[in-house]
Amino acid sequence: MPRPYVIIYFTESIDGRIASRTGYSKLSCPYDLKRLHLVRAQVDAVIVGASTARVDNPKLTVRLVEGRNPIRVVISASGNLNPSLNLFSVPPLTVVYTVSMEGGLERELKAKGVEIVRLSEITACSVVEDLYSRFSVKRALVEGGGRTIWSFVREDCFDELRVTISPVILGSGRNSVEGEGFDEGKRLKLVSYSACECGQEIHLVYVNKKD
């Protein structure tokens, strides 16, 4: 089935973490944040998993550059989400993909203008395919967390991966890509690399090789 062009973007520590064991995740310099917001402004939808929505409580809006806000998408198979999250409290449209959701919560979210989409099974591909057909999403950005990123990588459901390396060692915490892993790894093609304007970070762009 057709799907959007999918970009994965994350900023990680030198040792491959997106957050510390205490949840600290402010790894991006101002230039990297602006770069992320520029990508947000160029896509139709930005996707996060339920854990990222709960822990980071992001707005996922475009604020540091000129541009329109994308549709915000939360993937939550259980539908267990706090209705006071920023994603449900500020415009624009937020869509929740779920298998089930408690009736009272669903009514409360719908009253806030949130769209609830039930799928029989939640997979990375099923979500972006539905975004393509239901909301005409042609370009989508996946921002995390690690398990959500892994689901897109495992299903080979992405086209581009952008990663910024921050000059920080965390030692433990949340991995950038978190899952059962591959036996032999998945190889991508490096298409560009650059030193960040801050002089301390490296930004890498890979494309998914279709063998």
Role assignments for model-derived ranges:
Residues M1-D211:
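Enzymes that bind and transform nitrogen-containing heteroaromatic metabolites
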